[in-house]
Amino acid sequence: MKQTFLRLALTFALLLSALPPAPLDAANPPDPRFGAVESYMAPDLAADLRVGWDRMIIHWYTRQPDNADQWITPPEETDRIKIATAAGREVVALLMGTPAWATDGPGGGGVPRGLYLPANDPGNLWARFVRRIVGENKGAITHWIIWNEPDIALEDYGAQYAGTVEDYYQLLKVAYVVAKEVNPNAVIHLGGLTYWHDLVYNRPSYLRRLLDVAVKDKTAKAHNYYFDIFTAHIYFRTETVFNIVAIYRKILREYGLSKPIWLNETNAAPNDDPQYPAGPLIPVTMDGQASFIIQANALALAVGAERIAVYKFIDDTPSGYEPYGLFRVDHSARPAAEAYRLVTSHFTNLKRVMYSQQPNYYLVTLTRRGAVTRVAWARAGQEVTLRLPATPGTKAAVYDKFGKTYPLAADRKGFYSLTLPAAPCDKSGECYVGGSPWVLVETY
């Protein structure tokens, strides 16, 4: 009976997710800075939260499972792209997953056979795949991410690419050359890097190792070093969002490069969801996850990230797996969903960012079209009281992380007073996420 009920519930959820979202308000489209991975799984909810971009994985082994003559386009993939585009969400594709027949290595992550042949050689199987997939989606998909987390070494848990750094550079190079031939407007992203795998295993930064390979290639400079956008994945610790992006930008500059940086995955999965009892080991609650969503987006903007995406929009696994979604598999919302709504409502139409890091708090000021948004939170286990000058000629409202509005008035000297709640910290004093943020919005 329980299994029958679960099947019915999942079927109903899938039917709901297949419904077309509300029509796009052409005068007020979603802000493309703010995305959510796999929001196509629940397009109605994505439209409601005003998700601006989506990431969709296209597995090579799904297109050509058995041989090079196959080409299978899943019909649901085409529908997802159309629905997202109609709702104002840009779809960004991630290419990965070597078919077993196309590699001498492990299926899924092996180095494609013929990778070092010229890109126009029929024996270069990866080039043939990229040429066809980019051509098929010309006009629908412009941004292409080349593989996922290549910095996880083959011997480490979670490895997704079995090649060397040199092999990944060649994978990137071939994809760049072929994609630009098919669609000159194609934008090639470096596969998202985790940062921590190099740090934990005491390896030099993967980005540095990759660029060391690139600078030896005499053709690289003329081709933008074969990638247009750098991609990072950052989880759990709020403050590392700013710090890690800054580290990667510094490395790029050391090699004379200035690339846009996207934060394609960020989140802090909670460990206290009763529907997902086997939660992560890092002590972040659902309340803390909501704080993280606001803080991570604010810090990413402060450090100059061009786009940010939450991983992920909705869970696609039952209880017992890490609960990253803003929504559970049954479409019920975690508190983080309303925090995300606050971001897509009051962090948009950005013109300028100012950032203040103090020993006990953060303050990020977003100057927007027609408004000023200030985001503040405590860094440590003590509450902090702030006095912030009111912006002349504006009306103010202050929001908690769930979007609830509270009364706020400036004092006689024209200052607002905010008390920032203490950050939740463990027994060792480690504060993974800052205290509950306040979002002060002044409108002209």
Per-range role (PLM):
Residues 8-18:
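Bacterial N-terminal signal peptides
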Residues 164-294, 303:
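Noncatalytic carbohydrate-binding groove/subsite architecture in carbohydrate-active enzymes
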Residues 268-341, 355-360, 369:
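Aromatic/acidic polysaccharide-binding cleft in carbohydrate-active enzymes
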Residues 409-444:
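C-terminal beta-strand-rich structural cap/linker in extracellular carbohydrate-active enzymes
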